[in-house]
């Protein structure tokens, strides 16, 4: 079935950091693909803003080369590329110099803007320290209209205090309903499907609690190193970069109560309640229930790779590239159910998944049949493939057949072979529509930091040194110990 996307209203899409890595890899390809599918209005313009000394033609040449690198060849159409490039403008601005922003205003109010540009999307694809100054300069230049939106990339700050400072600075210019704090994990089809699976099927909800669920695992593993992001990453680490935002947002969708409606406020209200119910970790619990690691040299696939310290050119760096945490939620539904979270770079393979493992049957009923009865698991794969599968026990055909685990699976690519928008494509169109349902609200961000920041502080107080793990493995040995001491094991990975 061919699904035609609903067109969005004309807008000016302004990307601060328009020549950066995020714009080249994610934002501009996503906007091109929405143009390819006819979702961008004819008058929509895309304005790159950066310090680079480019004019419109130079920027278009740069973006053309970027599309060739980052868009699948069969999705590149020369006519669409030309149409897309014709939308582009470039403004050379020193983002730290407020007076430079007058040039942005000149482009926004230029005659080629037409009359349909009340909607202005300001995408801040730059360092969080610039969020406040950029918004302040936009406000001072009178460029923020009632229909404007601002998009903030994670992480929002380095800790609770800096997150609050950013939120205050941005909130002084934009109303909360205009602020879109993006987490691209929430735009993944399988993450959204989790809500439908939970709340659209009557059989699952009675099982979704501590009486039936043994534990939950949330994993985001990457096989790549830090690459060009070394300067940023060495000041952040895995907890700030991934766990405090991506993994906690996924945890919220797994653990939240049914919202009154699936709308912009109800879903976010329930996510906030989960974050506020996370049990704070004491110094002793942090020592016992968290693991940090840093990758050393090793073999990823067939490639010999160097260590993290070699990549960031700092032989003494103590930044964690791996973190695992055992967390608990203090409410009736989840009391006693551990949530195991882990994320790392230079792991054995790239995959992200949610594993909900159910408790075993109370009494084995088939002692005379060979084979094993594995626990039931609901596995939601987020990447590289998006899929949902239910693992259960079945008997092989024949009299005396063995017991073995089987899967009931929904693979999105197989079930829906037509191409669907990726996470950034979906979320960018939600921004233009003004729908913040899948974006983080201020209170969510600050609640997440309120839980995560003490962990960072306990590590610092204990002078925690990340354990080295070989690149191409599943992290430090301590990560396996964290879950195996509870009689459980990690799902996925090289094992």
From Swiss-Prot:
Keyword NADP applies:
yes
Q: Which GO terms describe its biological process?
A: glucose metabolic process; pentose-phosphate shunt, oxidative branch
Q: EC annotation?
A: 1.1.1.49
* GO CC field: cytosol
Query: Which residues does the Swiss-Prot or TrEMBL record annotate as the active site?
Result: 246
Functional pathway: Carbohydrate degradation; pentose phosphate pathway; D-ribulose 5-phosphate from D-glucose 6-phosphate (oxidative stage): step 1/3
Any Pfam family the entry gives: G6PD_C
Q: What are the UniProt keywords, alphabetically? A: Carbohydrate metabolism, Glucose metabolism, Isopeptide bond, NADP, Oxidoreductase, Ubl conjugation
Q: Is Oxidoreductase tagged as a keyword?
A: yes
Q: Which GO terms describe its molecular function?
A: glucose-6-phosphate dehydrogenase activity; NADP binding
- Give residues annotated as binding substrate: 184, 188, 222, 241, 345
List residues binding NADP(+): 94-95, 154
Q: What class of enzyme is it?
A: oxidoreductase
- Renumbered to this chain, where is the cross-link Isoglutamyl lysine isopeptide (Lys-Gln) (interchain with Q-Cter in protein Pup)? 51
Organism domain of life:
Bacteria
Q: Which PROSITE patterns match?
A: G6P_DEHYDROGENASE
Question: What is catalyzed by this enzyme?
Answer: D-glucose 6-phosphate + NADP(+) = 6-phospho-D-glucono-1,5-lactone + NADPH + H(+)
Q: Which SUPFAM superfamilies match?
A: Glyceraldehyde-3-phosphate dehydrogenase-like, C-terminal domain, NAD(P)-binding Rossmann-fold domains
Family that this chain belongs to: Belongs to the glucose-6-phosphate dehydrogenase family.
Q: State the protein's purpose.
A: Catalyzes the oxidation of glucose 6-phosphate to 6-phosphogluconolactone.
Which PANTHER family does its entry note? GLUCOSE-6-PHOSPHATE 1-DEHYDROGENASE (PTHR23429:SF0), GLUCOSE-6-PHOSPHATE 1-DEHYDROGENASE G6PD (PTHR23429)
Protein name, please? Glucose-6-phosphate 1-dehydrogenase
This chain is encoded by the gene named zwf
